[in-house]
Amino acid sequence: MDSRVIEIRKHLKKKLDPMRFEHTLGVSYTCQALAMRYGYDLDKAELAGLLHDCAKRYDRPTMLEKCISRGIPVSESEERDPSLLHAKLGAWMAREKYGVDDEEILSAIACHTTGKTDMGMLDKILYVADYIEPRRCKAADLPRMRKLAFEDLDLACLSIMESILRYLGTLDCPIDPLTIAACNRMRAVAARSREQAAAGNGEAGPEKIKEENTVESVKRNGKTRSRGAGREKGRRYKNY
């Protein structure tokens, strides 16, 4: 366990409301479980989970004000909906208030709400853990998402992004372009993962099937030509 964890927990318990603190513990626990499943550093996963919502102690106007005063970039989407800023502000607080200097942890905290196009392992772990943690009960399709998270992290990440986009679409809410870009990128990543898995299992893709059919056809034609040549040769010997 990272030596800072106990003190951070104590501090967060004082600063966050009880429900938010319980959610934080659930995400931290789930991050560690996913880290064990996918061979990632447990301490880094735990810290990312603990601090991902550390800026949720502030209301929306205060988050916007703090980001502006600290020189944290604010997009048009974030200006319209400052609640999105808790991720960026949380990453800043993790560095400046809690002494975290690990770039993977800071990246995961900063993108856990919208995602991003070049998500690393910890980015995906935190993004998924935030959705499936044990205390969540209202998110869409939770049983399937929880199962999928421990089978295929990329596909789980994509499925959660698509679910969130569908939900936001029903509310007619503006969608952050980062989320759309992240989802499109994750579709490509998930498709590549499926292709690699299929290749590893010996499943043939379209080009492989075409190649095998061509080879088989040549073999069959070769046999036909050999048998035909043999019969013709036999007839010549007989006539002779």
Question: Where are these predicted regions, by residue range?
Answer:
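Generic N-terminal amphipathic, Lys/Arg-enriched alpha-helix
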Residues: 3-17
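Divalent metal-dependent catalytic cores for phosphoryl transfer on phosphate-bearing substrates
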Residues: 10-14, 37-159
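Charged phosphate-binding loop/patch that engages nucleotide di/tri-phosphates or the phosphate backbone
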Residues: 167-218, 226-239
